[in-house]
Amino acid sequence: MNSKQYAYMNRSVRPSVSEIAAGLEKKFEITCLARDQEKLKLYRAICGVIAKVMIIPPECYIVVNKMPTYAGDVQAVYEKLTSAEIEWVAEKYCAQKDRIQNPHEWMRTTLYNSPEDMELDLLNQVLTDWGG
């Protein structure tokens, strides 16, 4: 076993959830996105959901879209997320938070689907604006 393999296996060497979340908060510039303390709290929760997924070994399964999915597949999508997608997820959450029974699961799935869903949502808005 080389030192890199040992470092990966040694949990104390890997970043913690809070360290990953702090890095995500900087990446997504959540202090710029948030218009008030409530939104800031929501953006931090979203970053926390992402961070919890990022520490799971890639070969493990997690539930996304009510289906077992490799954590590595979810992580690959999460690594490509942008501030715009994070903001879109937050807006969707605020619009239906009273109907969401498990916020953590909802966020995990919505984040995973956000690249395609956000694009479809924008396309539908354009078609609606054009009377289509």
What spans do the regions from the language model cover?
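Electrostatic interaction modules used in gene-expression and signaling proteins
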Residues: 1-132
